[in-house]
């Protein structure tokens, strides 16, 4: 008989009454007496468990002894209407197979609750908890929704390289990739590491962004997006930073900054609505356990138009408020999370899109405004998060881009291929980046970014 998933059984319970089924999964709990045992079984398809009723007389003592929390079992039996409270149906077990035992003396996940800090230490087992099974199902749903959104709009999914010779952000915080002997690398006459002897014949690193390569594709395909891992070697031990994370980066030909903002708002609302429509059981659990306002906040984002505001106007609001900030506010600063969250959570009480930032604090590729002081950048700010999306209209004029490269010290030889897209058939274009884990923080209500990715990579931590 073919196995049925618990989600399918619970979703269509009436049609399975009095039917024989086979279930396989992991034991969450077992209780009972010398006559009957009640097993809560979960197979990962849903937050919910199904109750298995075992007549002790049918099974040998050795089998039942191994049915402990964490054990993997296979059950066949009849679906019946439940006599007890808490579930509409249950399965009366006819046959039982213990596929994999879990010694209750050493299995670290017992019935008691565990702190999130403890669970990070056993990241290989935490998907078996209710919390992290919810997070991982939501992560899957959000990834699926990303592809669905862009596919419906006719965007082309482009795979950009993980190993690259460029620094898209100009930040310099990159992980180097090399096959040179680290104890005795080849050296130049000047005593520098000779990367011409390296695998790629030049210095290379793990990508910090797929944006530049995405722009190249947009200049041929019109509207594209990337969705892949990115890496930043920033020594930031905060609840908002990871060394390895995932980015969604659309790039669109013929989009001005207003078009870019429109797309970003539509995209975020689509993703949040998808979670509400398709993952409500998981959201209800997280709402109950971690954030009592989670679902209301998600609904508010879907239903509320985002505020659109110039950076200068935002600075004026922040200076005028009586709120005390750790970082002083003045025109020209890069707004901190506390400033962004004040605007979103206290002043407007809704998502905000900030535009027209000072040129000096933004990347070289952003298109300058006519005032010469600001660029057509945009950041989307969310409650509880701060910046969730960063983007801009890109500079499409070759001479202006070359001039900007000189200003920030970027050698044209390093990005000659990027500059050539402005040399041949240049077109106005825009794009943005959405940090997938920051989206997951918002959608799940979790407080630490290390709890929304299966195996977090942070300073001094690369386990599993």
From Swiss-Prot:
Gene Ontology CC, one term: cytoplasm
Gene3D superfamilies: Bira Bifunctional Protein, Domain 2 (3.30.930.10), Nucleic acid-binding proteins (2.40.50.140)
Recorded catalytic activity of this chain's protein: tRNA(Asn) + L-asparagine + ATP = L-asparaginyl-tRNA(Asn) + AMP + diphosphate + H(+)
Pfam family, one: tRNA-synt_2
GO MF, any single term: nucleic acid binding
Subcellular location: Cytoplasm
Record-listed E.C. numbers: 6.1.1.22
Main localization (coarse): cytoplasm
Keywords: Aminoacyl-tRNA synthetase, ATP-binding, Cytoplasm, Ligase, Nucleotide-binding, Protein biosynthesis
Entries under InterPro entries matching the protein: Aa-tRNA-synt_II, aa-tRNA-synth_II, aa-tRNA-synth_II/BPL/LPL, Asn-tRNA-ligase, Asp/Asn-tRNA-synth_IIb, NA-bd_OB-fold, NA-bd_OB_tRNA
GO biological process, one term: asparaginyl-tRNA aminoacylation
Oligomer status and interactors: Homodimer.
NCBIfam families reported for this sequence: asnS, PRK03932.1
Family the entry assigns: Belongs to the class-II aminoacyl-tRNA synthetase family.
Protein's recorded name: Asparagine--tRNA ligase
Organism: Cytophaga hutchinsonii (strain ATCC 33406 / DSM 1761 / CIP 103989 / NBRC 15051 / NCIMB 9469 / D465)
């Amino acid at each position: 008989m073919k196995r049925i998933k618990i989600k399918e059984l619970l979703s269509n319970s009436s049609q399975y009454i009095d039917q024989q089924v086979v279930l396989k999964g992991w034991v969450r709990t077992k209780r009972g007496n010398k006559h009957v045992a009640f097993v809560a079984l979960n197979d990962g398809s849903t937050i919910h468990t199904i109750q298995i009723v075992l007549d002790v007389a049918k099974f040998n003592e050795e089998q039942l002894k191994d049915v402990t929390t964490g054990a993997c079992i296979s059950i066949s039996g009849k679906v019946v209407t439940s006599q007890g409270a808490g579930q509409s149906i249950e399965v009366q077990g006819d046959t039982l197979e213990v596929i994999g035992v879990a010694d209750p003396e050493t299995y670290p996940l017992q019935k008691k609750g565990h702190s999130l800090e403890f669970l990070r230490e056993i990241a290989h087992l935490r998907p078996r908890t209710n919390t992290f099974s919810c997070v991982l199902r939501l992560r899957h749903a959000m990834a699926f929704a990303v592809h669905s959104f862009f596919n419906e709009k006719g965007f082309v999914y482009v795979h950009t390289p993980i190993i690259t010779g460029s620094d898209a952000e100009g930040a310099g915080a990159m992980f180097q990739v090399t096959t040179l002997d680290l104890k005795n690398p080849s050296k130049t006459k000047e005593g520098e590491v000779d990367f011409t002897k390296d695998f790629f014949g030049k210095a290379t690193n793990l990508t910090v962004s797929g944006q530049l390569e995405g722009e190249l594709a947009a200049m041929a395909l019109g509207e594209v997006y990337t969705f892949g891992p990115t890496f930043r070697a920033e020594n930031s031990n905060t609840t908002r930073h990871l060394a390895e994370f995932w980015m969604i980066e659309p790039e669109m030909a013929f989009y001005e900054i207003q078009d870019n903002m429109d797309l970003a708002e539509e995209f975020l609302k689509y993703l949040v609505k998808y979670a509400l429509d398709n993952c409500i059981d998981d959201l209800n659990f997280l709402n109950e356990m971690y954030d009592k306002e989670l679902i209301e906040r998600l609904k508010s984002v879907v239903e509320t138009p985002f505020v659109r505001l110039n950076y200068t106007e935002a600075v004026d609001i922040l200076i005028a408020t009586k709120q005390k900030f750790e970082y002083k506010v003045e025109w020209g600063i890069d707004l901190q999370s506390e400033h962004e969250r004040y605007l979103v959570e206290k002043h407007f009480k809704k998502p905000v899109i900030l535009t027209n930032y000072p040129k000096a604090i933004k990347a070289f590729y952003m298109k300058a405004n006519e005032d010469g002081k600001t660029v057509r950048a945009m950041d989307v700010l969310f409650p509880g998060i701060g910046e969730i999306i960063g983007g801009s209209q890109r500079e499409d004029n070759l001479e202006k881009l070359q001039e900007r490269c000189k200003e920030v010290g970027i050698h044209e030889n390093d990005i000659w291929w990027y500059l050539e897209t402005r040399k041949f058939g240049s077109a106005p274009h825009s794009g943005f980046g959405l940090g997938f884990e920051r989206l997951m923080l918002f959608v799940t209500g979790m407080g630490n970014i290390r709890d929304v990715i299966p195996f977090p990579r942070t300073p001094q931590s690369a386990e599993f």
